[in-house]
């Protein structure tokens, strides 16, 4: 198998995955992909879009919604099955696990002294929580035919190879 890697993949992330590919004996080359980050030359209709964690997913769903939606539409119209591989860690193995995820940005508390009194301030109390993100992922899955997979950073290279095989 030869894997095509998008040139826009973040340098430090690519170097980590590149070393995993090297240890697995996977052949690869870099060039711009139509959508996603990884694709096998054996099947141009299957792409993997790697995300570093659920907080990046929140950014795609909320702040970068239009750009992300355009990529989903582009993949669907081209007949490409898009798999989003999220490297969140061992706690999240399925889309269902996302429901119970606690966004650290939502629950971060800072204590300030205001007029001599300690006041609790919640940072980003409007941040997306697991329940909201779960609903968004289910909508994306159902509307655009996207598949969501999860792994740890240590198994990303192996999971990419498995998913593209």
Predicted regions located by residue number:
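Conserved catalytic cores of phosphodiester-cleaving nucleases, focusing on short active-site segments
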Residues: 46-52
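Non-catalytic C-terminal interaction segments of nucleic acid-processing enzymes
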Residues: 1-43, 56-165
């Amino acid at each position: 198998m030869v894997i095509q890697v998008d040139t826009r993949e973040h340098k430090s992330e690519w170097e980590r995955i590149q070393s995993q590919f090297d240890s697995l004996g996977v052949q690869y080359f870099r060039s711009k992909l139509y959508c996603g980050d990884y694709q096998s030359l054996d099947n141009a209709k299957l792409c993997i879009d790697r995300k570093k964690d659920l907080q990046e997913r929140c950014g795609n769903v909320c702040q970068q919604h239009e750009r992300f939606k355009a990529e989903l539409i582009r993949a669907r119209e081209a007949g490409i099955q898009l798999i989003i591989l999220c490297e969140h860690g061992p706690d999240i193995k399925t889309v269902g696990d996302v429901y119970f995820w606690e966004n650290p940005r939502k629950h971060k508390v800072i204590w300030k002294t205001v007029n001599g009194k300690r006041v609790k301030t919640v940072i980003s109390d409007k941040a997306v929580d697991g329940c909201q993100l779960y609903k968004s992922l289910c909508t994306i899955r159902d509307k655009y035919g996207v598949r969501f997979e999860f792994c740890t950073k240590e198994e990303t290279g192996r999971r990419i190879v498995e998913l593209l095989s």
